[in-house]
């Protein structure tokens, strides 16, 4: 410590003492001139100070010894990561009052000794100090038995504490965190004197202690306690390791607050660090200690806090801290003493305890330990800190808090209970500080939130504690682990480090800081009292976002019950959701509780709910978070969370329409969200919710209900909605007029309704992240993070709902509607008229203004929905991605949010300031796509938004004007694709917003065209007075056709679910969107996505593209800008923005890479780049459709598949050839454009594109059906996409967008398989991954010529094709895919492909992919039904039976094992038709017939054989299903079948059949053995033969004959099954003879003769098999026999299939 020898240069005076030091002085001491050193100030006792009281921590700058100029005010502490560091308080401004404690000159004078706790130095009273005595410290405790005993006891207690694994982990974490430098002033400045002694300590006691303690994280600190003192001679022996028994209070860096404050800061930092550890370990104890320290912002005063609590108290207190402390303390013990103390610490505590305490049950190994312990029982005079839970008193605030945290941890574990620590202000301090704490730290609120939203408010109030000095300390509990922190910053740091990074796996990770949505202005400010409760929400926002998606509280059922009908009743009262109270529980953990938790929505328009969490800062500033309208919430708590008491921001929403800074979307936009939030939960979503942590849906919830909820969520802002939809696809979208969509319902929605809305949101928001909250333009734009922080948007929504009904309409539209990209424009005009059309209803963007109140209500509801939207992260996202094509889908969700944001901008249209960038003119297809992002930007500036609105219609729908090309609207549509959410979201609000705009109609039109097809109805609710029909009208025009852009998801969404539309919530999609600029949808989406992404990471950074920088910049700030210009390094939210920006460099950098949007000055550099990085060499252009291919094989395959009847030639461009998309300035492209191709009608190419995309869509669907997740990352972005350089996949890599715009990353990847780091390049056929494009292309050639068994897209290949199918008529083919996706989710759905077929008819392809898909799907459905029946039969007969080999009677646990055994290794197996033959027949024949039975039954030859064997075996028991039929679980198999069918249609490759079979087998594996009998296996072979027969009439006839013969034999032996044969065969007979001529078909045809021969031989084999089966059947019994007969009949049916196929096709 400071010794006289090293006196300060100048004499210290009381006048020089910093104010914070005086504030931090404990009441027992005062500063006066020192008696031991006349030049210094000393600390004098004014009241009796009992022995054992602790003061600290010592605060100062953390420096290396070499940096310390004065040893007097320094303590040296050992940090595990930093080594020895000095806590230097030479600068009074950096220290606290402990720096004024002088060195004792003798042991008699000494009354304090240093302790090191958690690498912080504390002073502990060695003996009672009488008033008038000066506090003098020395650190040579070895000579003083009392000090030695105290240190020893400290060590012992520390040992016992650290013995617990939790404390160990916590200490380790704390050490790590502390090492990071979080605490810079833990130790006192007396280092100078301690320095020399410290050296001793290090040598003797400290060294060993360090070793002991380090594991505990406090050990490293212990050595520090002994500073090397300036006069080493004077203090060398004094080196006393500070006992670490007490966890050092985190030192706050805020000395100004007081030493306590400083301590708090430090503590908070430490706590943050520790929290990471503790939270990870769930070590509340340790956390508690640190938290306690943190909460003690009075830690500053806490330095003076007497740490009377003994190590045991510490033990009682949070273990982690005490553990660390103990470890540290032993080390800190006097250096000489340390070794011995250490030994004792290691042994005594563990040894017998000889000295029991007479007051409690504790026993001590040493008398000294007991004596030290006794201070706990000393008169409560010195124990002013009483536990509010149990009344136990503590000498220090830190100890008390540490202890209380233990209670709170327990409470935290009981979700039903509120955080009592916060609720219980037993400590007067706690109560006093309540408001302060509430406002400042969201952590406490979070904890409360976790426990109970309602309680949270109380807790928050109580969460603050009064410090010793009487200051109110705010407690900031972690919403995840309930750990309490002294400051919001610490709590947030803890959450980010400990929880949020872990949330990522849950799909809830926030990308970068969540954009804090500007909270609606002061309207919600009233609750702005700095009550932590609101903070809790915001705090939770960021994490909650992550969480909600993961976990839906059990309260969901409750909430759903309110919103189950899909409508959230909203009324003016609802619009002002003062408080949405939710129970916190697991849902809370995920932040979902807010969404799902019993939404006891006490909604009063004035309430500032915890949703204030819209922005953590906001929350801090105003717990109500209403005041923080403009603030961006770092994390938005799920605004819709019922538990959270959220004040409806509706009122303020209107005023703060511009408030949503992130999106710069007018509050109106938020309002629109507020309208009604319906969350459509697809079965998948439900599953996710259920599987998520504690996301079990209440019994009340049913699958059906969830979908209903989904719609409610849909009401949520489009951004949210898109997310949700992308995350979870709703199998069925609620009817446009469904209650959820009905505006009336919305209007009527009450706070209770709000609760329901919350539930919906939660359901939808499996990934409820702020995405759901996208209601607020800002948050929407801000991106996922914002979305994730759903709460703030909630506020925004509320505020907006109140004041900006119109504005909200816009935002609602954006958020809610899955943007109908293709028909967006068209629908714009139609928008108002058709409520009935589901897609239209989604897009209902009618400019209905409903009363602000209703709007506010709806806004609230929207907010509720938003969290659900946020949920997009879960698996639904995968489906959506697949449907929208990985890229499209991905960007879609993200884009959706941005779009929503844009939409809100228009909503803000009341400002009617034209958006510079988003002028109607910019509504070019590509520009349009970009515009939306810009719109987002404008969103921030209300005026711009308005302008955008009028000029570009809906920023959301389409930055472009209603007249803007449909592509743009489609893009927007894509952005809003989360139809499920959208439907519920009141688009009307956006409409209303639009109405203020100069182009309300256009806006509504835009909206209609925009994504909210489903949402539209919801939107209409937004103008609740207006029936959903109006919203539908808005959306009506877009209709399914509108979805064309978002084709995959959009079109699917009506039937599948909006989620299908939003399938691409993945943020990365932005790039893909841009790339697919050619695709209207894609082009548009990319822009949106970029914005979101950029917003997320960058948040407010305005895009260059979006001059409406105000809002846009806000949004961008929230999102990280993932796209960087390689010339000026400017970051952009989206490739679109980047692409727009590139024109700035067009002069100097005329060339650009279309894949990664990098600029090049020299053409050769570009060529080299494209070749080396993207594998693009010569480009081959199809003469028919002008599609570009990087590889000739792809072009040829394309021509074979799409132009089979046309004379196809191709143009080859040298690798250096530049195309328009390679020019930074497209205008120059015309001059230098590569050799122009002969102009041919684009119609053909368009049709072919459709077909191709249809096939790709099928592939995508298949992939989805197989349950494969597509990777979020969009590989197409190359440089700007965080992925390895993109190499064009084997599809139409170089497909140029019709507009020629946005060719950049999408061209090559339009049909790309999404590449991720793990699977950068994958064969779409067999799923094999390759390292580079050349390898891929080689493989593709081999794979294509290989057995047809390798399907076009591997079932498990998460490769959604990028291209969205966009029929000319605007109908999106993706609709079916969406349905399929849903089916895959487990709820088989009857798909109606009428639209698709209609589309295809224009193409007039012989076998349109759509037709095939339709037929296949129908077949699959029929099969599925039959399979279900058969399955039941199987269960009855053979389910119980084990898998027995029919040949050798060997039993197998798994059917797969049996199959393998039967196929390859059964020694007794009779020779079955050669596998090769079988495979060939199945391969070729199967493709030709593409009958579902063949598909299912014909897998790999091996499989088929195995199945045959199995069937033979099963013949023993009646096999309910044939292999094809037995597609195991009907649902799973059904999708597989349909996918297979499509595949067969595309490529008559038995590969598909094989896949289908395997999938079906897999699906039905439990029953499969029973289902698949020999007969069945044979039948598939026969079927395969029949397929090949299809290829050649000869073959078919021969096969038919053979089949008939075999059938006759079987019939003679098994007449019982005659009745069933016909029915079962019918399904299989639905085989199409026609189909696109694929390589497989050609191969099959070529091999016709050989096939015939093979078939003959295989037929013979099959007959043998049949006879064998019959024999088995005769043995097994009639049931089996009948089954065999059925099988035979199936074979016959298969043979007949070729004839029936055409009929089915027609």
From Swiss-Prot:
Domain SET: 27-140
InterPro entries named among the record's database cross-references: PRDM2, PRDM2_PR-SET, SET_dom, SET_dom_sf, Zinc_finger, Znf_C2H2_sf, Znf_C2H2_type
Gene: Prdm2
Catalytic activity annotation: L-lysyl-[histone] + S-adenosyl-L-methionine = N(6)-methyl-L-lysyl-[histone] + S-adenosyl-L-homocysteine + H(+); L-lysyl(9)-[histone H3] + 3 S-adenosyl-L-methionine = N(6),N(6),N(6)-trimethyl-L-lysyl(9)-[histone H3] + 3 S-adenosyl-L-homocysteine + 3 H(+)
Ligase recorded as keyword: no
Family: Belongs to the class V-like SAM-binding methyltransferase superfamily.
Name the UniProt record assigns to this protein: PR domain zinc finger protein 2
Domain of life according to the entry: Eukaryota
One Gene Ontology term of the molecular function aspect: sequence-specific DNA binding
SUPFAM superfamilies on file: beta-beta-alpha zinc fingers, SET domain
PROSITE patterns: SET (PS50280), ZINC_FINGER_C2H2_1 (PS00028), ZINC_FINGER_C2H2_2 (PS50157)
Organism whose genome encodes this protein: Rattus norvegicus (Rat)
Residue stretches of biased makeup (Polar residues): 185-199, 823-832, 891-912, 943-952, 993-1009, 1218-1227, 1528-1544
């Amino acid at each position: 410590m400071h010794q006289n020898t090293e006196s300060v240069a100048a004499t210290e005076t009381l006048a020089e003492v910093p104010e914070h030091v005086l504030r931090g002085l404990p009441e027992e001491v005062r500063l006066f001139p020192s008696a031991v050193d006349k030049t210094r100030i000393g600390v004098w006792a004014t009241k009796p100070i009992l022995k054992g009281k602790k003061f600290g921590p010592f605060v100062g700058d953390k420096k290396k010894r070499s940096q310390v100029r004065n040893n007097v005010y320094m303590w040296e502490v050992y940090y595990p990561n930093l080594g020895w560091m000095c806590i230097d308080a030479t600068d009074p401004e950096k220290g606290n009052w402990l720096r004024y404690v002088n060195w004792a000159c003798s042991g008699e004078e000494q009354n304090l000794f240093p302790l090191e706790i958690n690498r912080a130095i504390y002073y502990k009273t060695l003996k009672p100090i009488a008033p008038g005595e000066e506090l003098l410290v020395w650190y040579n405790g070895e000579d003083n038995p009392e000090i030695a005993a105290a240190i020893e006891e400290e060590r012992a207690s520390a040992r016992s504490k650290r013995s617990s694994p939790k404390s160990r982990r916590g200490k380790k974490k704390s050490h790590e965190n502390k090492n990071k430098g979080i605490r810079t002033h833990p130790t006192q400045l007396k280092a100078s004197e301690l320095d020399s002694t410290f050296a001793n300590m290090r040598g003797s006691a400290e060294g060993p202690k360090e070793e002991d303690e380090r594991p505990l994280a406090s050990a490293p600190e212990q050595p520090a306690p002994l500073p090397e003192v300036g006069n080493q001679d004077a203090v060398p022996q004094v080196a006393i390791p500070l006992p670490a028994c007490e966890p050092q209070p985190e030192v706050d860096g805020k000395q100004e607050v007081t030493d306590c404050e400083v301590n708090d800061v430090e503590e908070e930092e430490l706590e943050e660090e520790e929290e990471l550890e503790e939270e990870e370990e769930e070590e509340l104890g340790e956390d508690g200690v640190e938290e306690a320290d943190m909460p003690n912002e009075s830690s500053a005063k806490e330095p003076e806090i007497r740490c009377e609590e003994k190590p045991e108290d510490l033990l009682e207190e949070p273990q982690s801290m005490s553990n660390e402390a103990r470890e540290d303390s032993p080390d800190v013990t006097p250096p000489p003493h340390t070794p011995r103390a250490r030994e004792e610490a290691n042994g005594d505590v563990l040894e017998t305890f000889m000295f029991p305490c007479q007051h409690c049950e504790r026993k001590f190994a040493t008398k000294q330990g007991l004596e030290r312990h006794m201070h706990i029982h000393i008169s409560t005079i010195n124990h002013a800190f009483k536990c509010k839970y149990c009344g136990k008193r503590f000498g220090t605030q830190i100890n008390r808090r540490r202890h209380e945290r233990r209670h709170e941890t327990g409470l935290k574990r009981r979700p039903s209970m509120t955080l009592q620590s916060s609720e219980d202000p037993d400590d007067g301090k706690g109560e006093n500080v309540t408001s302060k704490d509430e406002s400042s730290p969201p952590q406490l609120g979070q904890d409360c939130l976790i426990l109970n939203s309602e309680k949270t408010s109380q807790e928050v109030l109580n969460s603050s504690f009064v410090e010793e000095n009487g200051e109110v300390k705010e407690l900031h509990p972690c919403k995840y682990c309930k750990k309490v922190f002294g400051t919001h910053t610490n709590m947030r740091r803890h959450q980010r480090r400990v929880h949020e990074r872990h949330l990522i796996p849950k799909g809830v990770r926030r990308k970068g800081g969540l954009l804090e949505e500007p909270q609606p202005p002061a309207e919600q400010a009233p609750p702005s009292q700095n009550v932590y409760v609101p903070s809790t929400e915001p705090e939770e926002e960021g994490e909650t976002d992550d969480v909600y998606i993961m976990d839906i509280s059990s309260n969901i059922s409750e909430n759903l019950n309110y919103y189950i009908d899909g409508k959230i009743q909203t009324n003016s009262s609802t619009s002002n959701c003062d408080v949405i109270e939710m129970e916190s529980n697991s849902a809370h953990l995920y932040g979902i509780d807010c969404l799902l938790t019993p939404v006891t929505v006490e909604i009063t328009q004035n309430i500032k709910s915890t949703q204030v969490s819209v922005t953590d800062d906001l929350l801090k500033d105003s717990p109500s978070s209403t005041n923080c309208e403009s603030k961006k919430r770092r994390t938005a708590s799920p605004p819709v969370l019922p538990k959270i008491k959220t004040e409806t921001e509706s009122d303020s929403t209107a005023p703060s329409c511009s408030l949503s800074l992130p999106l710069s979307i007018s509050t109106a936009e938020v309002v629109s969200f507020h309208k009604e939030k319906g969350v459509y939960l697809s079965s998948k979503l439900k599953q996710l919710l259920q599987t998520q942590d504690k996301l079990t849906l209440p019994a009340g919830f049913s699958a059906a209900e969830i979908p209903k909820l989904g719609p409610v969520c849909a009401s949520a802002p489009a951004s949210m909605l898109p997310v949700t939809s992308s995350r979870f696809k709703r199998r069925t979208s609620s009817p446009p007029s469904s209650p959820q969509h009905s505006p009336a319902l919305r209007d009527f929605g009450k706070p209770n309704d709000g609760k329901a809305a919350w539930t919906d949101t939660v359901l939808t928001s499996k990934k409820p992240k702020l995405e759901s909250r996208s209601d607020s333009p800002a948050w929407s734009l801000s991106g996922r993070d914002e979305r994730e922080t759903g709460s703030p948007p909630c506020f925004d929504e509320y505020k907006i709902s109140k004041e900006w009904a119109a504005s909200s309409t816009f935002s609602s539209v954006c958020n809610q509607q899955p943007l109908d990209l293709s028909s967006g424009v068209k629908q714009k005009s139609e928008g108002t008229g058709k409520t009935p059309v589901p897609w239209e209803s989604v897009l209902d963007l009618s400019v209905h203004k409903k009363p602000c109140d209703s709007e506010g209500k709806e806004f609230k509801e929207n907010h509720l929905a938003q969290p659900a939207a946020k949920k997009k992260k879960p698996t639904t996202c995968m489906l959506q991605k697949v449907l929208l094509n990985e890229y499209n889908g991905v960007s879609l969700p993200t884009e959706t949010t941005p779009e929503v944001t844009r939409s809100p901008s228009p909503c803000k249209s009341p400002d009617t300031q034209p958006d510079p960038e988003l002028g109607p003119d910019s509504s070019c297809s590509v520009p349009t796509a970009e515009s939306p992002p810009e719109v987002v930007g404008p969103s921030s500036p209300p005026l711009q938004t308005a302008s955008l609105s009028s000029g570009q219609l809906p920023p959301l729908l389409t930055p472009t004007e209603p007249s803007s090309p449909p592509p743009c609207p489609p893009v927007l549509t894509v952005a809003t694709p989360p139809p499920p959410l959208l439907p519920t979201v009141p688009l009307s609000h956006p409409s209303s917003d639009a109405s203020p705009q100069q182009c309300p109609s256009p806006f509504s039109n835009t909206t209609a065209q925009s994504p909210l097809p489903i949402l539209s109805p919801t939107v209409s609710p937004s103008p609740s007075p207006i029936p959903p029909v109006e919203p539908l009208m808005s959306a009506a025009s877009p209709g399914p056709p509108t979805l064309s852009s978002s084709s995959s998801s959009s079109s699917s969404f009506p039937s599948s679910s909006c989620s299908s539309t939003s399938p691409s919530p993945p943020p990365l999609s932005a790039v893909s969107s841009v790339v697919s600029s050619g695709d209207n949808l894609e082009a548009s989406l990319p822009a949106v996505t970029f914005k979101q992404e950029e917003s997320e990471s960058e948040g407010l950074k305005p895009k260059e593209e979006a001059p409406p920088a105000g809002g846009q910049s806000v949004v961008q700030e929230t999102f990280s800008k993932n796209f960087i210009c390689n010339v000026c390094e400017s970051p952009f939210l989206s490739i679109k923005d980047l692409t727009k920006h590139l024109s700035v460099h067009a002069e100097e950098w005329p060339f650009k890479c279309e894949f990664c949007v990098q600029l090049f000055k020299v053409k050769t550099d570009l060529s080299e780049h494209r070749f080396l990085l993207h594998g693009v060499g010569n480009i081959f252009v199809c003469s028919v459709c002008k599609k570009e291919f990087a590889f000739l094989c792809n072009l040829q395959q394309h021509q074979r598949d799409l132009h089979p009847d046309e004379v196809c030639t191709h143009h080859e461009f040298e690798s250096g050839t530049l195309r328009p998309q390679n020019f930074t300035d497209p205008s120059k492209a015309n001059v230098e454009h590569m050799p122009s191709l002969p102009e041919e009608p684009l119609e053909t190419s368009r049709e072919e594109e459709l077909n191709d995309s249809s096939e790709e869509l099928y592939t995508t669907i298949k992939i989805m059906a197989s349950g494969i997740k597509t990777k979020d990352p969009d590989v197409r972005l190359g440089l700007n996409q965080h992925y390895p350089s993109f190499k064009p996949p084997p599809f139409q890599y170089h497909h140029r967008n019709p507009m020629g715009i946005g060719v950049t990353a999408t061209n090559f990847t339009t049909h790309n398989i999404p590449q991720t780091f793990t699977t950068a390049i994958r064969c779409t056929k067999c799923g094999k991954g390759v390292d580079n494009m050349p390898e891929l292309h080689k493989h593709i050639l081999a794979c294509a010529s290989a057995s047809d068994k390798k399907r076009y897209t591997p079932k498990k290949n998460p490769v959604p094709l990028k291209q969205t199918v966009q029929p000319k008529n605007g109908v999106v083919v993706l609709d079916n895919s969406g349905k399929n996706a849903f089916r895959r989710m487990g709820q088989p759905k009857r798909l109606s492909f009428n639209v698709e077929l209609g589309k295809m008819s224009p193409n007039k392809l012989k076998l349109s992919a759509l037709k095939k898909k339709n037929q296949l799907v129908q077949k699959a459905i029929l099969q599925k039904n039959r399979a279900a029946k058969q399955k039941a039969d199987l269960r009855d007969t053979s389910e119980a039976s084990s898998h027995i080999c029919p040949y050798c009677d060997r039993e197998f646990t798994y059917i797969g094992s049996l199959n393998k055994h039967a196929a390859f290794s059964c020694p007794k197996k009779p020779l079955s038709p050669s596998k090769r033959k079988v495979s060939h027949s199945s391969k070729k024949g199967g493709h030709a017939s593409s009958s579902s039975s063949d598909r299912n039954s014909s897998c790999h030859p091996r499989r088929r054989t195995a199945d045959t064997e199995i069937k033979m075996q099963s013949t023993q028991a009646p096999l309910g299903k044939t292999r094809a039929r037995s597609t195991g679980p009907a649902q799973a198999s059904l999708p597989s079948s349909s996918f297979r069918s499509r595949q067969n249609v595309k490529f008559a490759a038995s590969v598909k059949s094989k896949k289908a079979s395997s999938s079906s087998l897999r699906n039905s594996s439990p029953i499969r053995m029973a289902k698949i009998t020999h007969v069945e296996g044979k039948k598939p072979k026969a079927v395969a033969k029949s397929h090949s027969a299809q290829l050649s009439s000869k073959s078919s006839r021969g096969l038919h004959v053979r089949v008939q013969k075999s059938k006759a034999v079987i019939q003679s032996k098994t007449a019982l099954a005659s009745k069933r044969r016909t029915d079962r065969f019918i399904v299989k007979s639905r085989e199409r003879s026609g189909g696109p001529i694929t390589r497989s078909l050609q191969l099959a045809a070529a091999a016709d003769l050989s096939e015939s021969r093979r078939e003959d031989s295989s037929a013979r084999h099959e007959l043998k098999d049949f006879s064998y089966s019959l024999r088995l059947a005769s043995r097994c019994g009639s049931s089996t026999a009948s089954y065999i007969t059925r099988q035979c009949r199936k074979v016959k049916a298969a043979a007949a299939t070729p004839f029936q196929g055409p009929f089915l096709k027609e």
